[in-house]
């Protein structure tokens, strides 16, 4: 059973979003997604200040099995990328909700996300 944290919201494409307040958010891929992908070998992160439109791919996680795009849940601006993943992409596997986060972003339009209960239902 995949770990799902109650303090986050989730997308249909298996990303988690943590509201930091002040219209800033932290984002990563879910435990379910990292388990399906397998051992991470590379993460292509966006640049700070990149502006991304809703539903656009802005990041790629690459595992021994496949490469998978990460899609924007809103119109957003990247304010930080997790540079630790450059040297340790496996943090996405070992700590997807903590040290393995992908980006922090600013947005005024994050909507249509699922709470932990709704996300658990789509996994079953």
From Swiss-Prot:
Gene3D superfamilies: 2.40.50.100
Single GO cellular component term: glycine cleavage complex
Signal sequence bounds: none
Highest taxon of the lineage: Bacteria
Alphabetized UniProt keyword annotations: Lipoyl
GO BP term, example: glycine decarboxylation via glycine cleavage system
Sites of N6-lipoyllysine modification: 65
Cofactor: (R)-lipoate
Residue intervals of the Lipoyl-binding domain: 24-106
Cofactor annotation comment: Binds 1 lipoyl cofactor covalently.
One Pfam family recorded for the sequence: GCV_H
S-adenosyl-L-methionine is among the record's keywords: no
PANTHER family reported for this sequence: GLYCINE CLEAVAGE SYSTEM H PROTEIN, GLYCINE CLEAVAGE SYSTEM H PROTEIN-RELATED
Self-association state and partner proteins as the record states: The glycine cleavage system is composed of four proteins: P, T, L and H.
Biological role stated in the UniProt entry: The glycine cleavage system catalyzes the degradation of glycine. The H protein shuttles the methylamine group of glycine from the P protein to the T protein.
Family: Belongs to the GcvH family.
NCBIfam families per record: gcvH (TIGR00527), PRK01202.1 (NF002270)
Protein name as it appears in the record: Glycine cleavage system H protein
Source organism (scientific name): Vesicomyosocius okutanii subsp. Calyptogena okutanii (strain HA)
Gene (UniProt): gcvH
């Amino acid at each position: 059973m995949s770990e799902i944290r109650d303090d986050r919201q989730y997308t249909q494409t298996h990303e988690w979003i943590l509201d930091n307040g002040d219209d800033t958010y932290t984002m990563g891929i879910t435990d379910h997604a990292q388990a399906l992908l397998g051992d991470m070998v590379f993460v292509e992160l966006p640049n700070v200040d990149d502006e991304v439109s809703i539903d656009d791919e802005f990041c790629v996680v690459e595992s021994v099995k496949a490469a998978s795009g990460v899609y924007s849940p809103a119109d957003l601006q990247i304010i930080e990328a997790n540079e630790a993943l450059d040297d340790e992409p496996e943090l996405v596997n070992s700590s997807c909700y903590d040290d393995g986060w992908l980006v922090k972003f600013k947005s005024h339009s994050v909507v249509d996300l699922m709470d932990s209960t709704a996300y658990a239902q789509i996994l079953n």
